[in-house]
Amino acid sequence: MTLNISNLELTGKNIVIVEDDLPSIRYYETLLKNSGADVMIFHTGKEFIDYLAQGNKPIDLVFMDFLVPLINGIECIRILRKDRKSTPVVMITAYSSEQAKTEAYIAGCNEYVLKPIYPEKIFFLLEKYLKSSISVPHSY
């Protein structure tokens, strides 16, 4: 099966990516460019927190890097959870330690995914949290 992001009906969905690694940002942009979703990218945790403080539009899903500059991903999740308790957050990281994973879940992330994250997993997460209609092979 060939996965095609344009098969997802994400029009009107707001997806936030908090990531400082340029190749990772390009990867997300490539996967999501034809989805119809509004994708917002923040290169530092501070940019994301400043955005939250403005009380802007709803956020439907957050892809959060663990180690982003200025304010790390764990602290970003804690701050997000003060006002947006139900916004799904997927922590994406290279940190495989149980301590890091536990810390992320305690902060309030919904998923803890190790890099590299493959398109099938991203599609699965989009379907799971945004309730789209794509059929994805569920091997997770």
Question: Where do the PLM segments sit?
Answer:
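Short amphipathic alpha-helix used as the core "switch/output" element in two-component signaling
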Residues: 74-85
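The feature encodes the CheY-like receiver
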Residues: 69, 97
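Acidic catalytic/metal-coordinating carboxylates
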Residues: 23, 44, 72-75
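Two-component/phosphorelay signaling modules centered on CheY-like receiver
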Residues: 22-40
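Non-catalytic signal-transmission and effector/linker regions of two-component phosphorelay proteins
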Residues: 1-16, 120-140
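Conserved acidic carboxylate
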Residues: 19
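Active-site beta3 strand of CheY-like receiver
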Residues: 57-63
